[in-house]
Every structure is written in C-alpha cells, then in structure tokens.
C-alpha cells in the first residue's frame, strides 16, 4: 500500500498491552489497538498510559493503527536521564 493512502490521527494512550501494543482513544472518541512503529521500536522509545501520540491507520481497517510519534509536552520525567559513558 502506498504511503499516501494512510490516515494520520492523534490520540491518547489509555492502556499499555503486552507485546508493544496499546489501547488508544482518538480525538474523535474512537478506540483502537495500536502497535509501535519500526523506528520507535528500534530506538526503544517508551510509551506510557496518558501519552499523546500520532497514529497511522489504513483506510481498510480502522480498528488497528501504528504509533509513529509520541508527544512529550505535558509529561513529567519519572526517571533520571541516562548517564553517558565515555
């Protein structure tokens, strides 16, 4: 499928599920199951309940989506930043 056909939406993570999946409520109230995109999985970007995310969805299946971006504006840091080794 071509990238132009994907629908991009924003939503809030309600629940973290096993196997890097999330229950997300979109801005329009629709709930779906989303999984972490490849680059986010590669760089181990953590997504927690309450995070605002951007999703890509196929127009053929609106019950599944792929998380492509995590917005970090209103979240506080719960762990100290990792130390860099020299």
UniProtKB/Swiss-Prot annotation:
It is found in: Cytoplasm. One of the essential components for the initiation of protein synthesis. Stabilizes the binding of IF-2 and IF-3 on the 30S subunit to which N-formylmethionyl-tRNA(fMet) subsequently binds. Helps modulate mRNA selection, yielding the 30S pre-initiation complex (PIC). Upon addition of the 50S ribosomal subunit IF-1, IF-2 and IF-3 are released leaving the mature 70S translation initiation complex. Its main location: cytoplasm. CDD domains: S1_IF1. It comes from Acidovorax sp. (strain JS42). This is Translation initiation factor IF-1 3. Belongs to the IF-1 family. InterPro entries: NA-bd_OB-fold, RNA-binding_domain_S1_IF1, TIF_IF1. HAMAP family: IF_1. Residues 1-72 form the S1-like domain. The keyword Ribosomal protein does not apply. Signal peptide: none annotated. Keywords: Cytoplasm, Initiation factor, Protein biosynthesis, RNA-binding, rRNA-binding. GO terms for cellular component: cytosol. One of its GO terms (molecular function) is ribosome binding. Component of the 30S ribosomal translation pre-initiation complex which assembles on the 30S ribosome in the order IF-2 and IF-3, IF-1 and N-formylmethionyl-tRNA(fMet); mRNA recruitment can occur at any time during PIC assembly.
């Amino acid at each position: 499928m071509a990238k132009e056909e994907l629908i991009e939406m924003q939503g809030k993570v309600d629940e973290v599920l096993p196997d890097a999946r999330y229950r997300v409520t979109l801005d329009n109230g629709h709930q779906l199951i989303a999984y972490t995109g490849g680059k986010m999985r590669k760089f181990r970007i953590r997504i927690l309940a309450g995070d605002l995310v951007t999703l890509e969805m196929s127009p053929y299946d609106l019950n599944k989506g792929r998380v492509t971006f995590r917005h970090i504006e209103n979240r506080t840091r719960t762990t100290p930043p990792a130390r860099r080794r020299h």
